[in-house]
Amino acid sequence: MAKEKDTIRTEGVVTEALPNATFRVKLDSGPEILAYISGKMRMHYIRILPGDRVVVEITPYDPTRGRIVYRK
C-alpha cells in the first residue's frame, strides 16, 4: 500500500469473514469494503471475528480495499 501519510484511517465493524484472512468491513462513514489483516496482526496471531470493531487504513487510490491495523 501507500506510505503512512497517504492513507486514511477510519473505524468500522467486521460483517463477514472471507477466505485468506480477508474480511468485509462496514465503515462508520457508510460504505462496505474488503480488508485484509496487516502483517504484524498476522504475526502475533490476533484473531478477528465478525462483529469486532477495527481500525482500517484505506488508500486514496482504491477506496474499496483496505488493511486492518487494529482491533478494538
From Swiss-Prot:
Q: Name one GO molecular function term.
A: ribosome binding
Question: Looking at the UniProt record for this protein, which Gene Ontology cellular component terms does it annotate, in alphabetical order?
Answer: cytosol
- Outline the extent of the S1-like domain: 1-72
Which controlled-vocabulary keywords does the entry list? Cytoplasm, Initiation factor, Protein biosynthesis, RNA-binding, rRNA-binding
Q: What CDD domains does the record tag this protein with?
A: S1_IF1 (cd04451)
Q: PANTHER family recorded for this chain?
A: TRANSLATION INITIATION FACTOR IF-1, CHLOROPLASTIC
List the SUPFAM superfamilies hit by this protein, alphabetically.
Nucleic acid-binding proteins (SSF50249)
The function of this protein is: One of the essential components for the initiation of protein synthesis. Binds in the vicinity of the A-site. Stabilizes the binding of IF-2 and IF-3 on the 30S subunit to which N-formylmethionyl-tRNA(fMet) subsequently binds. Helps modulate mRNA selection, yielding the 30S pre-initiation complex (PIC). Upon addition of the 50S ribosomal subunit IF-1, IF-2 and IF-3 are released leaving the mature 70S translation initiation complex.
Q: Does the keyword Protein biosynthesis apply?
A: yes
Which proteins does it associate with, and in what oligomeric form? Binds to the 30S ribosomal subunit, contacting protein S12 and the 16S rRNA. Component of the 30S ribosomal translation pre-initiation complex which assembles on the 30S ribosome in the order IF-2 and IF-3, IF-1 and N-formylmethionyl-tRNA(fMet); mRNA recruitment can occur at any time during PIC assembly.
Q: Which Pfam families does UniProt cross-reference here?
A: eIF-1a (PF01176)
- The family this protein is said to belong to: Belongs to the IF-1 family.
| Protein name, entry field | Translation initiation factor IF-1
Q: Where in the cell is it found?
A: Cytoplasm
Q: Name the source organism.
A: Thermus thermophilus (strain ATCC 27634 / DSM 579 / HB8)
